[in-house]
From Swiss-Prot:
GO terms for biological process: mitochondrial translation; translation. PANTHER family: 39S RIBOSOMAL PROTEIN L32, MITOCHONDRIAL, LARGE RIBOSOMAL SUBUNIT PROTEIN BL32M. This is Large ribosomal subunit protein bL32m. Keywords: Mitochondrion, Ribonucleoprotein, Ribosomal protein, Transit peptide. It is found in: Mitochondrion. GO terms for cellular component: mitochondrial inner membrane; mitochondrial large ribosomal subunit; mitochondrial matrix; mitochondrial ribosome; mitochondrion. It comes from Homo sapiens (Human). The lineage of its organism: Eukaryota, Metazoa, Chordata, Craniata, Vertebrata. Belongs to the bacterial ribosomal protein bL32 family. MRPL32 precursor is processed by the m-AAA protease (composed of AFG3L2 and SPG7), which cleaves the N-terminal transit peptide. Cleavage by the m-AAA protease takes place prior to assembly into the large subunit, an essential step for mitochondrial ribosome (mitoribosome) assembly. Proper processing by the m-AAA protease is dependent on the zinc-binding region within the tightly folded C-terminal domain of MRPL32: zinc-dependent folding halts degradation initiated from the N-terminus and triggers the release of mature MRPL32.
Length: 188
């Protein structure tokens, strides 16, 4: 049979004592259960401890509470700030040039509607107009089809008032709108 051996190195840090004591108690509870069905050896685990003998004894809780302090209890107090930041440090941190809002130099005027927009980006006002017109066309198509899954597999052409279908539009589905064609909606 193999002899179990545990080596503990004790630090002068007071929170480490509680942590080591908890691990030692847990180890003592788990050892008899570690090999069910096999007789336990007549000897216990060998322990090498550098420090006072109080670490090898289980902690007797006099308050009646059975809660053991865990490793997290000793870590949470370490994460708390120990000193207050000075006002100079706070101002430097808050007014850091990397954190300030950058000035945009790529603002342009939309040539269609005159609203402000970013360069190389579609104008939000014009995009909203296109979305509304597209939604109206889709609503009209839905009324003609009578259902969402009854669309024919042919190409669709949108005609506005005063427009007639061309020779290229023969055999295509034609949607007629009761208004003038918008300037931004090309016929092709």
């Amino acid at each position: 049979m193999a002899l179990a051996m545990l080596v503990l190195v004790v630090s002068p840090w007071s929170a480490a004592r509680g942590v080591l004591r908890n691990y030692w108690e847990r180890l003592l509870r788990k050892l008899p259960q570690s090999r069910p069905g096999f007789p336990s050896p007549p000897w216990g685990p060998a322990l090498a401890v550098q420090g006072p003998a109080m670490f090898t004894e289980p902690a007797n809780d006099t308050s009646g509470s059975k809660e053991n302090s865990s490793l997290l209890d000793s870590i949470f107090w370490m994460a708390a700030p120990k000193n207050r930041r000075t006002i100079e440090v706070n101002r430097c941190r808050r007014r850091n040039p990397q954190k300030l809002i950058k000035v945009k130099n790529n603002i342009d005027v939309c040539p269609e509607c005159g609203h402000l927009k970013q360069k190389h980006v579609l104008c939000a006002y014009c995009y909203e107009k296109v979305c509304k017109e597209t939604a109206e066309i889709r609503r009209q198509i839905g009324k003609q089809e009578g259902g969402p899954f009854k669309a024919p597999t042919i190409e669709t052409v949108v005609l506005y008032t005063g427009e007639t279908p061309s020779e290229q539009d023969q055999g295509k589905r034609i949607i007629e709108r009761d208004r003038k064609r918008p300037s931004w909606f090309t016929q092709n």
